[in-house]
C-alpha cells in the first residue's frame, strides 16, 4: 500500500524541499530529553478533533531545503535529538529523510530521532515508497496511529488517544523508561516571545494552562 504525499522541489536545485509549518529549537514535550522540533505542513489523514488542524492543508507554508533545516538543528547546542511532527512527516518522507541523514552524518546515531505519524506502523512497513521504508530505519521512537477524539486520554505519554501506540524501533531508548518519562516530559509546553504564545503538547489548543497564560497577557491579572 502506497502513501500519498506531496513533493516540493526547488526551481534552482534538484533538492527536495520541506513544507514546514513551524519549528522550535528546544522542547521537552515532544519526546525524550531536550529536542528540536519541526512541524511539517500537510496531512491527508485529517483526523477529526486534531489540535494541529491548521497543519492539514498541503498548501505551501515555508518551503525550506533539508540542508537548511539540518544546519539549523546542528547549530543548536545541548539537544539530544530531533522530533518531526505535523502535519504528516511521512507524506514528505524524502525531505525528512534527507534532513535526518545530513544530521546523522555530523552527529552519528547518538543524535536521536522521534517522529509522530497518523499512520499505523504496519501501513508504513507495507509502503512501496523506498523513502518511507528507509526513513523508518533512522527512527528511534515512532508515535503512530490516527488521533481518535472519542479515545482521547490526557494521561498518555506522547500520544493523544488510546488507540495510538509508541514503537521503539532501535535499542537507543528502553521502553522501560516510560514511567520516568511520564514525570520528566510535560504534557503542555508554552514558550513566550515578545509577540507570540507558542503552545505544544497533548491536552488541546484551549487547555487550562494556555487559557491562564492568555488571561495574564491580555488583562495583566495574576492567577
Model regions: which residues?
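P-loop/Walker A phosphate-binding loop and immediately adjacent motor/lid segment at beta-alpha junctions
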Residues: 92-107, 152-196
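Conserved Radical SAM active-site core
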Residues: 16-22, 34, 52-130, 134
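Charged phosphate-binding loop/patch that engages nucleotide di/tri-phosphates or the phosphate backbone
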Residues: 185-223
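Short beta-strand/turn micro-motifs composed of small residues
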Residues: 117, 170, 201
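Structural recognition of alpha->loop->beta junctions
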Residues: 128-151
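Cys/His-enriched microdomains
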Residues: 45
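N-terminal [4Fe-4S]-dependent radical SAM core
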Residues: 4-39, 48, 52-58, 187
